[in-house]
């Protein structure tokens, strides 16, 4: 299977670019326009799905849920102006 490898930083840059350039039809732009309350609900939803996948689903399904949680976490970062280095200093 061929796939594009993204890093935490490259995903952040991609989302930041979408926020700044606002491509038509972008789900990221739509989520940012709805605000942190909407984004926060998605973070919570995906966190729950990670837990359920860890308990009851395959490793592949778990990895997919983790990727969705990372996406929504980074959308929240963009919405709030938090940069990856702000997160890294707390790891």
Curated annotation (Swiss-Prot):
Main subcellular location of this protein, as a coarse class: cytoplasm
Could you give one GO CC term from the UniProt record?
cytoplasm
The cross-references to InterPro entries, in alphabetical order and at most eight, read:
HisE, PRib-ATP_PPHydrolase-like
- Asked if the record carries the keyword Ribosomal protein, the reply is no
Q: Which cysteines are joined by disulfide bonds?
A: none
Any idea where this protein resides? Cytoplasm
Alphabetical list of Pfam families matching this protein: PRA-PH (PF01503)
Question: Reaction catalysed by this chain?
Answer: 1-(5-phospho-beta-D-ribosyl)-ATP + H2O = 1-(5-phospho-beta-D-ribosyl)-5'-AMP + diphosphate + H(+)
Pathway listed:
Amino-acid biosynthesis; L-histidine biosynthesis; L-histidine from 5-phospho-alpha-D-ribose 1-diphosphate: step 2/9
In the record, biological process GO terms are: L-histidine biosynthetic process
Report the domain of life of the source organism: Bacteria
Q: What is its EC number?
A: 3.6.1.31
Q: Report the family membership.
A: Belongs to the PRA-PH family.
Q: What is this protein called?
A: Phosphoribosyl-ATP pyrophosphatase
Species assigned in the record? Corynebacterium efficiens (strain DSM 44549 / YS-314 / AJ 12310 / JCM 11189 / NBRC 100395)
